UniProtKB/Swiss-Prot annotation:
Protein name: 3-isopropylmalate dehydrogenase
Keyword terms of this UniProt record: Amino-acid biosynthesis, Branched-chain amino acid biosynthesis, Cytoplasm, Leucine biosynthesis, Magnesium, Manganese, Metal-binding, NAD, Oxidoreductase
Taxonomic source organism: Debaryomyces hansenii (strain ATCC 36239 / CBS 767 / BCRC 21394 / JCM 1990 / NBRC 0083 / IGC 2968) (Yeast)
EC number(s) reported in the record: 1.1.1.85
NCBIfam families associated with the record: leuB
InterPro entries assigned: IsoCit/isopropylmalate_DH_CS, IsoPropMal-DH-like_dom, Isopropylmalate_DH
Record-level GO cellular component terms: cytosol
């Protein structure tokens, strides 16, 4: 990773971040992310940066306090911020009733038009290769990003449950996509591919041999790529075949993976196992192309709320790397993002790790170490 290029001229930057800790470990990981943001405020040597942090409720915590998983106050705060940092939502306490924590997450995605979910899959440090459930020689060099369409498809389609009797019930969900939705997510994937030199290849995953929605998906992707991005490489892969490749030889899918809401949900969770822990993987959900490094976005770890995990045991790295994505894509703080990613790698290499990475450090100890490391990286680069 290249060293951040920092200039010495003073520039003032003020950014507002809505923090939605959510449930269980969400509060802990958000606290460590805030710690790192404050360290960057203190350390950035060539400009004054101020992160205005505002905490609000979402998920089960919001249900307990207000009866709704996404209070209007939380939504309005998110709409008026530069970016949103989310911890995790859900847990068995709230069950699967008519009001559920996950409804808050679905609603905020829809209300903020967060149509593109980006989930990188790589190794923050080669020292983590041995932790993968796959052989090191198979996973070494894995580096792809899943670009998942987030506000369409079967999760937002019409659904129905009918019961003629206790023994005879029927239920269905509807998968629906428009050319506009597929065009928009294809452009996001192409933009991400073009941020690299040479540009990254793009893999489009669907089930076009069976589903009408996938056939529309494939023809639309082809049209957009041929007309707008002829310089990029696009390959189509059936989702079941891609799931197999991901286990057999994940580096074959290196580049940008574009897929629908449900397929993206499944394939990105499968991919999250490759680095050895969900506690390592960040994500970003964007409302527009980050072409000026100022796209509005929501950032969260790929892991859930982990209600069974005792205090100070959760790995904060995924949330901290989500902050790095936020700095790069939404807050126009690219040098700070690079410094933070470098700091995370240094800390992991030093052996300061939580239990999921066969370490003995606590959540706070990892957060403290990364905060100190990013200060040193920033100050050394002047």
């Amino acid at each position: 990773m290249s060293q951040p290029e920092l200039k010495k001229s003073k520039v003032d930057i003020s950014k507002t971040i809505t923090v939605l800790p959510g449930d269980h470990v969400g509060e802990e990981v958000c606290n460590e992310a805030i710690k790192v943001l404050q360290a960057i405020e203190d350390a950035t040597p060539y400009r004054n940066i101020k992160f205005n942090l505002q905490k609000h409720l979402i998920g089960g915590a919001a249900i307990d306090a207000t009866g709704t998983p996404l209070p209007d106050e939380s939504l309005e705060a998110a709409k008026n911020s530069d970016a949103v940092l989310l911890g995790a939502v859900g847990g068995p306490k709230w069950g699967t009733g008519s009001v559920r924590p996950e409804q808050g997450l679905l609603k905020i995605r829809k209300e903020l038009n967060l149509y593109a979910n980006l989930r990188p899959c790589n190794f923050a440090s080669d020292s983590l290769l041995e932790l993968s459930p796959l052989k090191s020689e198979i996973v070494k060099g894995t580096d792809f990003t899943v670009v998942r369409e987030l506000v369409g498809g079967i999760y937002f389609g019409e659904r129905q449950e009918q019961a003629e009797s206790e023994d005879k019930q029927t239920a269905w969900d509807t998968e629906k996509y428009s050319t506009e939705e597929v065009t928009r997510i294809t452009r996001m994937a192409a933009f991400m591919a073009l941020q690299h030199n040479p540009p990254l290849p793009i893999w489009s995953l669907d089930k076009a041999n069976v589903l009408a929605s996938s056939r529309l998906w494939r023809t639309t992707v082809d049209k957009v790529m041929s007309e707008e991005f002829p310089q990029l490489t696009i390959q189509h892969q059936l989702i079941d075949s891609a799931a197999m490749i991901l286990v057999q030889s994940p580096t074959k899918l290196n580049g940008i993976i574009i897929t629908s809401n449900m397929f993206g949900d499944i394939i990105s969770d499968e991919a999250s196992v490759i680095p050895g822990s969900l506690g390592l993987l960040p994500s970003a959900s964007l409302a527009s192309l980050p072409d000026t490094n100022s796209a509005f976005g929501l950032y969260e770890p790929c892991h859930g709320s982990a209600p069974d995990l005792t205090e100070n045991k959760v790995n904060p790295v995924a949330t901290i790397l989500s902050v790095a994505m936020m700095l790069r894509l939404s807050l126009d703080c690219v040098p700070e993002a690079e410094a933070l990613e470098k700091a995370v790698g240094q800390v992991l290499d030093s052996g300061i790790r939580t239990g999921d990475l066969r370490g003995s450090s606590s959540t706070k100890e990892v957060g403290d170490a990364i905060a100190e490391a990013v200060k040193k990286v920033l100050n050394q680069s002047v």
